[in-house]
């Protein structure tokens, strides 16, 4: 492809301008990016060192395990190997800074000045040569005009030949200058790209050597590392022997073998009965989270003798329940009412469930079967005998059915353990209870407990109990209470209820019993 001198000259100037305006600014940007690259690699090396320090710490933990000791040593070795590779990488990147970044910084500043000066020098020489050629061409034109119309044609012809030779030689010089300048400009450009490639090839050789060393090091250790973790269920032989010894108990003489506890068979039978009952027990929804509300008309069903004292009993019931929680129940386990036969209750107030599907609706006088005999926060769970619908309902809206009460009276108390008073009859309301005579003290223990004294002291002085007629052999002097009245013998700390015959009671809301 042939090009004219002017086109080649433009190529030369453009080459110099590309080096000055594009290559050198690109090198400056490359230097900044290289510095960022160095920072990132240094941060990666530091992060890797911290990471593999953590791996080594976990390996130290594993070395304390009887089955993972070898794995712990492998983790420590992996940590040290990778830290060594990171140190080698750090050394290679120090060469990256020294051979590339530092050299580029040094060359770029000098090269900008050099290329600007070279371009200006080329342009100046090219302009001088063009001026000389143009001057010679102008002289040649003058001589040719003179030789055409003058007398001395031979004289001007000789000068014309000389100027033609001068113009021709100067044109050759310009063409040679343009060609040499273009070649020099292209070579200057190539030298700069070659320098950049050479520096990166040198760094690549260092990285290649680093990767070869890393591959050789990892290939020598990786199979052994993988072998230690190929089977996670493998247990060392020493540990297996220990486990087998634990599995195989040492034989003991027959005489030393303990006999099974008699409570074991009882527990098995109880558990079997419980499983049978739980298998056929109804699946019920959870009890309502709110406390069951008490009927506002509940006092209407109390005895007339106690109807006037409902407010006082409500206040006293709160204080009494704090002393002994077992007195809250009107029907205890000892009465036999909590046996497996399902109890029935009769509703005394209507109840509407509303939008709550877990509650049971009923009218006054309906009969319900209790599926769960125990109350939960004032709620009972049962089934309507007519509609066969199940749900929760307030216990204060029902009372025990008559037939259930008769059965409860006929069931004997099977408990052999000492049972405290089961009835929650308010003793202040009973004026017909007869106090036993003082000779009852003979069958009692001489050391009365302090809690019995406290219970006796809680009985108000206005009690309607009839004081017993003192026997002649009784103590003539009896202590007096605070208001000056004679203190009955049973208030001296003895049990006043041992001979009291209690009536069966039915409690609707656990606050006021109904005396039958």
Curated annotation (Swiss-Prot):
Residues forming the IMD domain are 1-249
The ranges of region (Disordered) come to 303-328, 454-516
Gene Ontology terms, cellular component aspect?
actin cytoskeleton; cytosol; nucleoplasm
Can you provide one Gene Ontology molecular function annotated for this UniProt record? actin binding
Q: Tell me where in this chain the SH3 domain is found.
A: 340-403
Record's protein name: BAR/IMD domain-containing adapter protein 2-like 1
> Could you tell me where the Polar residues compositional bias lies?
474-485
Q: Show the domain comment.
A: The IMD domain is predicted to have a helical structure. It may induce actin bundling and filopodia formation.
Q: Which domain of life is it from?
A: Eukaryota
| Gene that this sequence comes from | Baiap2l1
Assembly with partners or alone: Interacts with RAC1. Binds to F-actin. Interacts with FASLG.
- Organism listed in the record: Rattus norvegicus (Rat)
Q: Where in the cell is it found?
A: Cytoplasm, Cytoskeleton
Please give the function described in this protein's UniProt entry: May function as adapter protein. Involved in the formation of clusters of actin bundles. Plays a role in the reorganization of the actin cytoskeleton in response to bacterial infection.
- Modification sites for Phosphothreonine: 248, 257, 413
Coiled coil, from the record: 115-148
Disulfide bonds, paired cysteine numbers: none
Matching entries from Pfam families are given as: IMD, SH3_9
Q: Which InterPro entries match?
A: AH/BAR_dom_sf, Baiap2l1_I-BAR_dom, I-BAR_dom, IRSp53/IRTKS/Pinkbar, IRTKS_SH3, SH3-like_dom_sf, SH3_domain
Q: Where is this region: Binds F-actin?
A: 488-516
List residues, modification Phosphoserine. 261, 281, 332, 415, 421, 423
């Amino acid at each position: 492809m042939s090009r004219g001198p002017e086109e080649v000259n433009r190529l030369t100037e453009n080459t110099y301008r590309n080096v000055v305006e594009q290559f050198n600014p690109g090198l400056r940007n490359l230097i900044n990016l290289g510095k960022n690259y160095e920072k990132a690699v240094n941060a990666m090396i530091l992060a890797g060192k911290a990471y593999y320090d953590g791996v080594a710490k976990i390996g130290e933990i594993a070395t304390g395990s009887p089955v993972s000791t070898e794995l712990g040593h492998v983790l420590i070795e992996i940590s040290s190997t990778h830290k060594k590779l990171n140190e080698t990488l750090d050394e290679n990147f120090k060469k990256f800074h020294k051979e590339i970044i530092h050299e580029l910084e040094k060359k770029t500043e000098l090269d900008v000045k050099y290329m600007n000066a070279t371009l200006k020098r080329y342009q100046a020489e090219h302009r001088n040569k063009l001026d000389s050629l143009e001057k010679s061409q102008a002289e040649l034109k003058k001589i040719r005009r003179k030789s055409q119309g003058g007398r001395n044609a031979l004289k001007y012809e000789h000068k014309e030949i000389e100027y033609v030779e001068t113009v021709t030689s100067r044109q050759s010089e310009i063409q040679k200058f343009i060609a040499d300048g273009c070649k020099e400009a292209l070579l200057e450009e190539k030298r700069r790209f070659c320098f950049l490639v050479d520096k990166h090839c040198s760094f690549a050789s260092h990285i290649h050597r680093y990767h070869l060393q890393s591959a050789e090091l990892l290939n020598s250790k990786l199979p052994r590392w993988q072998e230690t973790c190929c089977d996670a269920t493998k247990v060392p032989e020493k540990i297996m022997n220990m486990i087998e010894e634990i599995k195989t108990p040492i034989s003991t003489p027959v005489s030393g073998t303990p006999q099974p506890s008699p409570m074991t068979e009882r527990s098995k039978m109880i558990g079997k009965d419980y499983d049978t009952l739980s298998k056929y027990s109804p699946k019920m929804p959870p009890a309502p989270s709110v406390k069951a509300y008490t009927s506002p008309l509940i006092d209407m069903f109390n005895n007339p003798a106690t109807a006037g004292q409902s407010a006082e009993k409500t206040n006293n019931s709160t204080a009494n329940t704090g002393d002994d929680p077992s007195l809250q129940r009107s029907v205890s386990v000892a009465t036999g009412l909590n046996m497996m036969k399902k109890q029935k209750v009769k509703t005394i107030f209507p109840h509407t469930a509303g939008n709550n599907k877990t509650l049971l609706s009923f009218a006054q006088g309906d009969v319900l079967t209790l599926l769960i005999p125990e109350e939960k926060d004032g709620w009972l769970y049962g089934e309507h005998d007519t509609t066969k619908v199940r749900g929760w309902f307030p216990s204060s809206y029902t009372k025990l059915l008559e037939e259930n009460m008769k059965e409860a009276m006929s069931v004997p108390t099977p408990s052999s353990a000492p049972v405290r008073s089961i009835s929650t009859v308010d003793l202040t309301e009973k004026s017909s209870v007869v106090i036993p005579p003082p000779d009852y003290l003979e069958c009692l223990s001489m050391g009365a407990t302090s809690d019995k004294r406290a219970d006796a002291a809680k009985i108000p002085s206005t009690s309607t109990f009839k004081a017993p007629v003192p026997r002649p052999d009784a103590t003539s002097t009896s202590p007096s209470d605070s208001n000056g009245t004679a203190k009955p013998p049973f208030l001296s700390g003895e049990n006043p209820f041992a001979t009291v015959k209690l009536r069966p009671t039915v409690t609707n809301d656990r606050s006021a019993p109904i005396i039958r």
